[in-house]
Amino acid sequence: MEITNPILTGFNPDPSLCRQGEDYYIATSTFEWFPGVRIYHSRDLKNWSLVSTPLDRVSMLDMKGNPDSGGIWAPCLSYADGKFWLLYTDVKIVDSPWKNGRNFLVTAPSIEGPWSEPIPMGNGGFDPSLFHDDDGRKYYLYRPWGPRHHSNPHNTIVMQAFDPQTGTLSPERKTLFTGTPLCYTEGAHLYRHAGWYYLMVAEGGTSYEHAVVVLRSKTIDGPYELHPEVTMMTSWHLPENPLQKSGHGSLLQTHTGEWYMAYLTSRPLRLPGVPLLASGGRGYCPLGRETGIARIEWRDGWPYVEGGKHAQLTVKGPQVAEQPAAVQGSRRDDFDASSLDPKLQTLRVPFDDTLGSLTARPGYLRLYGNDSLNSTFTQSTVARRWQHFTFRAETRMQFSPVHFQQSAGLTCYYNSKNWSYCFVDYEEGQGRTIKVIQLDHNVPSWPLHEQPITVPESAESIWLRVDVDTLVYRYSYSFDGETWHAVPVTYEAWKLSDDYIGGRGFFTGAFVGLHCEDISGDGCHADFDYFTYEPV
């Protein structure tokens, strides 16, 4: 059996790999998207399906007002003592010497839940993980962050004992590692194998310099010695490798005794004419940070990536029977169910009757007008990840705005300061019109502002479509669902990427979805008959 990377396409970073018997799970970060954390299941490490979105209550995750790329950072999923343990950080500030990250622990008897109410685990850092030692003791690891550590890019990994009976941490913090010259040490996981404790961390920052670093010690407190090659995995030395940014590893031994590591990776698109080693030459990744898997071999008591330390497109699978490919469900959503399809998410807040309804008009998704796409509070946005470099997304909408502060339509979205929006609104003296707007690093542009497209009064429905073609994308519209007209604007798909956004809010990936806003607060709504996403 051969596994093709990435195993989780589109925005699925910071994988945490976990085994229960012959079942395997990966938890990934969701940042400002709700519900928080996505958990995938497999029995062969090749075919994966989404089975749980555990942080689905405000009591577990209150992100209203969180900044772009705040929210859920690097969850840690483990199984011990007959239940699943999930650690996560809700980051409230991203661009300062303070993160104000709030760490929590929830547990569940089954991966589907029910998940407990969260136990606070302190606010001193991020990327927490939990290690269950063979003697039953439990240890909590994380990267501390604050004014002093902010100025020191090496940072540290610290550990505290955790008492599961009282839900409390020991006040003593033990420093396990102070980093290598690669800097930006984070994403720590601890393992025990063949008489050694192994500490696996991410370093180099989560861009092209990203790497996995491993250390070991005979005692849990250390001292820890570095891997002979320092970096166990990185793609930094191979700029033409199709899988880049490889790092943030999570190790696992299968029930057949084989070893694998999940890691995050990205597939860059290179711009024509830009030299490989020039600024931007390595490319742009609109699909965000995805999840890959590597096969691990042990030599002289150290783990190594089979085939070399770089991320590889194909990997030999474990000695288990290949399972049927996961049924992903129709890529057409007719909104006939009583709840949103799990592939759809909202921004920061749950989908409730403030945002919309699936029952107000059966067979339609009704979105109520709320904040603009520029907001970080209450937005009526329902979207899904870009998972392919070429695809078409389409919807049919019924919407009757009465003034210019009301709009609804289709968006391609990276964060609150970088998106495009093809929408219907209202112009006095003209009636309903179709326009597009782009926000690029928070700078707006309205290419059709002087000549909007008039919607015929007889048009009961309006169809909107976006075609993404590798580096560019274009919107189009129809008034009958058969004859389509292109909006005369071409947008650059590569700009909806971590690499273009930069700064401190660049941890997600591009989404496409439906949106309705009413900044007047008068209370409009839009009804969406369907939403399709089809790779081309």
Protein language model features and the residues they cover:
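Carbohydrate-active catalytic/glycan-binding domains of CAZyme proteins
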Residues: 1-536
